[in-house]
A protein has these predicted regions:
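Mobile cap/lid helix-loop segments that border enzyme active or cofactor-binding sites
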Residues: 1-59, 112
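Amphipathic alpha-helical segments within well-ordered protein domains
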Residues: 33-34, 50-51, 68, 85-86, ...
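Iron-sulfur (Fe-S) cluster-binding segments and ferredoxin-like electron-carrier domains
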Residues: 43, 81-100
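Alpha-helical scaffolds flanking conserved acidic
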Residues: 60-67
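Short, thiol/selenol-centered motifs that function as redox-active sites or metal-ligating centers
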Residues: 67-85
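Short Fe-S-cluster ligation motifs
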Residues: 103-114
Length: 114
């Protein structure tokens, strides 16, 4: 049970484009975004940050998601770990690779670049 109840999409129609962009990026509407909707300025800044991180670039999306999984685990956020693992799978990481993410230096599942 969250300490702050996330807003319902029906309560914030003016933020619909933000949640559509987030859903397109992640495949779902995240509760943390619905909670940030109490502060639209923070929500908009956070979305810009996330879009910048996940924009096409030199690092593949699968690897970005695996890095996110390690960061989430290091921060102790099980909510974030679940979403990062799901996203890593969505972008090409198989179950074994996700399970072995902490052995990236020694596991044959990872390339030298990873």
């Amino acid at each position: 049970m969250p300490r702050i109840q996330p807003k319902q999409l029906s309560e914030i129609p003016e933020l619909a484009p933000i949640f559509q962009a987030g859903e397109q990026l992640m495949g779902f509407v995240a509760n943390d975004g619905l909670t940030m909707a109490y502060r639209p300025d923070i929500l908009k800044a956070f979305l810009a940050l996330v879009q910048s991180i996940y924009a096409d670039g030199k690092v593949e999306n699968e690897l970005k998601r695996l890095i996110g999984l390690i960061c989430s685990a290091a921060a102790g956020c099980e909510y974030c770990q679940a979403h990062a693992a799901n996203s890593a799978e969505k972008y090409g990481a198989n179950f074994e690779k996700i399970q072995a993410v902490w052995e990236f230096r020694t596991s044959d599942l990872f390339t030298a670049r990873e």
